[in-house]
């Protein structure tokens, strides 16, 4: 199983909607969205995936962006109130995989879901902070989540033992787009070849965007296009 991890920027959401609409996502691909904003595009993407019955993970407590503050600051009778209502209704559909990041607000979210009858066995959980592994063990000691994303590190391997999904940032991001000229072609990943041998049920990455999230954009002096392709040895390489 492949879990492409995106941050829910406008262009990423539009790309996902296009892929879903045109049935271009295989059964083995489950996108993960960490929404950075409560927007009509986000709820439209959810609606499209529900329509075509393709599973998608939506993180309810994103660590970046303004989604959480957008949610809390919604005013009654506003257009944002409509987005919030649609999001909440669609989030209950079985196509949407309820997901959370193990961080400061994870405990309260788990308690909220428990009160509302959400089964922990249906959740996708993201473990990237070792400080919250004890909370993970406490919350999922008797119930194993559907998917547990984690880096390939010894402490995480000891603490997260079941339904493990490898999460890694494979993209070697440069400071400037022009710098990619110095390395026009390079290795990207071989996780798809070995993840089962390493004890994982799936793998996840941030594609050619990378894990780094910047709140504000800027106009670059150069434009870089990144193309991921299969090499002869079945590994993935990226050409800039």
Enumerate the predicted regions with their spans.
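N-terminal, charge-rich interaction modules
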Residues: 2-8, 23-26, 36-38, 179-190
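Catalytic beta/alpha-barrel core
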Residues: 4-8, 33, 55-62, 96-106, ...
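Conserved, mostly hydrophobic/aromatic
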Residues: 16, 31
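Active-site-adjacent beta->alpha loops and helix N-cap segments on the catalytic face
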Residues: 40-43, 106-113, 132-138
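Long, charge-rich C-terminal accessory regions
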Residues: 135-240
């Amino acid at each position: 199983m492949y879990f492409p991890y995106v941050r829910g920027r406008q262009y990423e959401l539009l790309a996902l909607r296009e892929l879903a609409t045109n049935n271009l996502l295989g059964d083995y691909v489950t996108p993960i969205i960490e929404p950075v904003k409560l927007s009509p595009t986000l709820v439209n993407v959810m609606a499209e995936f529900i329509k075509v019955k393709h599973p998608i993970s939506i993180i309810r407590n994103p660590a970046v962006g303004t989604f959480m503050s957008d949610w809390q600051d919604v005013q009654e009778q506003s257009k944002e109130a409509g987005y919030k209502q649609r999001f909440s209704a669609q989030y209950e559909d079985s196509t949407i995989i309820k997901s959370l990041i193990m961080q400061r607000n994870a405990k309260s979210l788990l308690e909220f879901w428990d009160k509302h009858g959400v089964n922990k066995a249906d959740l996708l959980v993201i473990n990237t902070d070792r400080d919250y592994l004890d909370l993970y063990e406490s919350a999922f000691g008797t119930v194993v989540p559907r998917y547990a994303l984690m880096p390939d590190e010894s402490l995480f391997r000891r603490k997260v033992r079941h339904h493990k999904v490898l999460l890694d940032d494979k993209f070697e991001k440069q400071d400037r787009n022009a710098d990619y000229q110095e390395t026009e072609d390079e290795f990207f990943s071989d996780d798809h070849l070995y993840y089962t041998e390493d004890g994982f049920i799936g793998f996840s990455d941030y594609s050619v965007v990378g894990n780094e999230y910047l709140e504000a954009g800027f106009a670059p002096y150069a434009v870089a296009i990144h193309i991921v392709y299969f090499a002869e040895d079945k590994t993935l390489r990226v050409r800039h």
